[in-house]
């Protein structure tokens, strides 16, 4: 990952798996983990330790973003269903679903803050209708996701072939 000074860009993104993406698109909102799962930050800390995450409880009250060209969001998605060594050798890495937002727009959100680690994070929720620039969905998930997309967001959703990617 390049130094922050070299990484300032136009977009930030939030990545997630296909199941969560269906719920996000259906609701039209990106939700913090505490809002999405109806659990406390403390409960989520205990659950997520199994996947190697050591985040403090208050992190789960925010929607986190990475810079638009960084892979960190895909690493988070991978940590929840890590591919085996054979999958990596064959290039069977499937990227997560990405929700891109213009940085200049999201810094105007009343719930935004900076933690020194993420480029930005937002407390509780973000309306896709107000902030989404583009949703990039791996082509292989199209049938699973397309029925969950609200009419108002269809023009912002794009499917890209992503089979055979490797880290």
Q: Could you say what each language-model-derived stretch is?
A:
Residues 1-167:
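NAD-dependent ADP-ribosyltransferases
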